[in-house]
Amino acid sequence: YTLDDVFYMNMKNDVSCIIDNRMALMEHQSTWNPNMPFRGFRYAGELYNKYVVENDLDLNRRKLIMIPTPQYYVFYNGNEKRPEREILKLSDAFKVPVGEGCFEWTATVLNINYGCNKELMEKCSILEGYAIMVAKHQ
């Protein structure tokens, strides 16, 4: 599923799809933004709303409805030095600290700058080519 012409935070959505009951949301960032978990959370909410409507699911039933498992990835290639992989948590933005068992949403940020995440680049030559092109033009 993709959200046609859905805007959030003044940006158009990047890519989303459902494969093997997993809802993969992928976003590209060329500038560091600690609000990525919140952006992805909002985006996922829109996708789940669309999924419920398109599959004619009744949220008021007494039976648990099954939904795709979300996975949110951010591909980062900005100038700020960042680790190859980091997990950002939405709960870091909560005004009141949460305890165990409380809701959590994460963004898996993958640094796709040239020289980073070599295993990923070896598996995806298009991504590697993009990293090389960006490095040459920076």
What do these predicted regions represent?
Residues 1-138:
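Elongated, amphipathic alpha-helical interaction scaffolds
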